[in-house]
């Protein structure tokens, strides 16, 4: 009975390969979710392993399913990093963008040299590159390039079957090793006390302007009611003059109770002894403003103000590249406090310091009275309202346009050159992602949808690759041997060590962000998390967003370039 059930199961998977794909995804996402100290296989590697095991029974998958999901994935990658990529190329992120490009060259050359020395074929070399640099997306472009080599179908399949083998063997150290090299070895090799460097960075960029810890006046606040005593420092002053008594702190007088009546605190309203004032700010600073002998009052009616928090998508060119300190002086910023700033495709949290610059495409969480929040939102951009509706017409048109452009073949002499449909979809994503950050009236793709296109798009592609190469996987692993793992260690480690020294001594990045720049250029999010943990700060993330955008793009394209170098 058991044999009959197994035979039926295998026969069903062969007859309906879509079931095998979903089964690979289920197993991959489940086992990929397990981590130890923040490190694990991840969904991509776990899906590949599950697909290879399932593929041992010999399942054939045909049709456009694989390129369909891969194009969707590449577009999502470009769409997510587009604003940071363009900023890095065109504006104030140029040093970090150039650094990322240099690191990407190291990341290409190390596995290329390793593959040449080891004598690997082009498929194994592409897998070695993808695994050691943890850039799964490159396998799609490498596959396109290999298919265009003009080899026989049998030889092409043999080469392509070697790619997932090399990827699976080298990916684990590519992930774990990168985190170890950057977070644990990096500070020692560079002679950096990471925690002290981050504190130094905060002081240099405005952190000491805040009492009670760097940045706290920007996002830690309370609203209290105080009675103004005789001869208090605010007596006889207008609201604007009273708020200016402590220039380095964000303190706002919101309402007044004068002669029993509640009035809004306009900038020219005069404060008198005996008034009850509703003030927003840190409590120790509030007492300093009103006077040491200030009497706190439980005036619930005065304090009953509508307070709201809003996520704002920054689109205004008037605030682009402005520091928080500059923006705080704008009338529209009065009465508003920052809770959080996130940036980039993976929503890296940016430290809140007076000299922190806002960029178009950032999402800032602001809190304050409803009218104050509305004014600040208008100054910054527009509310980033949650929605479950994606502009599918835009997605389809954008991917189609990119793929059409990529399909064009350019001839230089007798040499045909093409971006391929994959490269076209990636570039389309970059362009339209940037365009939406400056013209957010179209092309809405909610973050969960971008995640789905990114994650599921890649993993369906990986599942099909694994299932198709399953029968030849074991034979390929035996042929490549343990030496492949060691070459993967070399290909992972060498570029990172070079990157750290180049970042510190050639580009002269601040000690607090140099490892974040290296993490971004290698697109290794696990490393950034470990670096932040070592630093006990979010400061290293300031070096991550631009380098990640450039690195993610170039490392993906390198999959095609590596095939050209190997042939």
Swiss-Prot record:
Cellular component GO terms, alphabetical: plasma membrane
Keyword list, A-Z: Cell membrane, Membrane, Repeat, Transmembrane, Transmembrane helix, Transport
Pfam families according to UniProt: Asp-Al_Ex, TrkA_C
GO biological process, one term: potassium ion transport
Topology of this chain in the membrane: Multi-pass membrane protein
GO molecular function: monoatomic cation transmembrane transporter activity
Superkingdom assignment: Bacteria
Regions that span the bilayer: 15-34, 41-63, 68-90, 97-119, 170-192, 392-409, 413-435, 455-477, 481-503, 540-562
Subcellular location: Cell membrane
Major subcellular location class: membrane
Stretches assigned to the RCK C-terminal domain: 211-295, 297-382
Family: Belongs to the AAE transporter (TC 2.A.81) family.
The name this protein goes by in its record: Uncharacterized transporter bll3476
Record organism: Bradyrhizobium diazoefficiens (strain JCM 10833 / BCRC 13528 / IAM 13628 / NBRC 14792 / USDA 110)
């Amino acid at each position: 009975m058991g044999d009959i059930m197994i035979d039926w199961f295998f026969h069903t998977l062969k007859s309906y390969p879509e079931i095998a794909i979903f089964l690979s995804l289920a197993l991959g996402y489940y086992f990929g979710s397990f981590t130890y100290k923040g490190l694990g296989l991840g969904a991509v590697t776990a899906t590949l392993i599950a697909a290879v095991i399932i593929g041992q029974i010999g399942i054939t998958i045909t049709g456009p399913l694989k390129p369909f999901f891969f194009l969707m994935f590449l577009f999502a990658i470009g769409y997510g990093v587009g604003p940071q990529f363009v900023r890095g190329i065109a504006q104030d992120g140029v040093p970090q963008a150039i650094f990322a490009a240099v690191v990407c060259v190291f990341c290409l050359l190390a596995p290329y040299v390793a593959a040449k020395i080891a004598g690997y074929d082009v498929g194994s070399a592409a897998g070695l590159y993808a695994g050691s640099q943890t850039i799964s997306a490159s396998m799609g472009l490498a596959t396109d390039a290999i298919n265009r080599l003009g080899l026989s179908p049998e030889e092409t399949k043999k080469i392509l079957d070697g790619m997932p083998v090399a990827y699976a063997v080298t990916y684990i150290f590519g992930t774990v090793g990168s985190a170890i090299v950057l977070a644990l070895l990096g500070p020692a090799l560079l002679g950096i006390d990471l925690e002290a460097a981050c504190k130094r960075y905060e002081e240099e960029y405005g952190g000491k302007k805040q009492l009670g810890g760097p940045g706290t006046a920007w996002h830690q606040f309370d609203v209290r009611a105080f009675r103004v005593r005789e001869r208090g420092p605010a007596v006889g002053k207008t609201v604007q003059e009273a708020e200016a008594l402590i220039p380095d702190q964000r303190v706002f007088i919101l309402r007044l109770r004068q002669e029993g009546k509640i009035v809004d605190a306009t900038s020219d309203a005069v404060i008198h002894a005996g008034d009850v004032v509703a003030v927003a700010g840190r409590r120790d600073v509030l007492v300093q403003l009103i006077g040491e002998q200030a009497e706190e009052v439980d005036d619930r009616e005065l304090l009953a103000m509508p307070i709201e928090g809003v996520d704002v998508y920054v689109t205004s060119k008037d605030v682009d590249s402005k520091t928080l300190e500059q923006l705080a002086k704008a009338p529209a910023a009065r009465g508003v406090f920052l809770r959080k700033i996130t940036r980039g495709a993976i929503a890296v949290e940016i430290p809140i310091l007076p000299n922190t610059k806002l960029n178009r495409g950032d999402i800032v969480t602001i809190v304050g009275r409803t009218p104050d929040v509305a004014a600040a939102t208008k100054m910054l951009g527009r509310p980033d309202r949650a929605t479950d509706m994606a502009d599918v017409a835009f997605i389809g048109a954008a991917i189609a346009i990119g793929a059409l452009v990529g399909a064009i073949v350019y001839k230089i002499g007798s040499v045909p050159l093409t971006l391929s449909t994959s490269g076209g979809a990636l570039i389309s994503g970059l362009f339209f992602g940037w365009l939406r950050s400056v013209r957010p009236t179209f092309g809405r793709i909610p973050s969960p949808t971008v995640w789905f296109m990114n994650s599921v798009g890649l993993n369906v592609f990986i599942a099909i690759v694994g299932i198709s190469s399953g029968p030849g996987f074991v034979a390929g692993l035996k042929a490549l041997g343990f030496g492949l793992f060691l070459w993967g260690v070399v290909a992972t480690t060498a570029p990172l060590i070079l990157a750290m020294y180049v970042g510190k001594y050639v580009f002269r990045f601040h000690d607090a962000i140099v490892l974040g720049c290296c993490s971004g250029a290698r697109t290794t999010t696990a490393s950034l998390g470990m670096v932040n943990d070592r630093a006990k700060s979010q400061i290293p993330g300031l070096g991550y967003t631009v380098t990640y955008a450039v690195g993610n793009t170039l490392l993906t394209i390198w999959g095609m370039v590596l095939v050209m170098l190997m042939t």
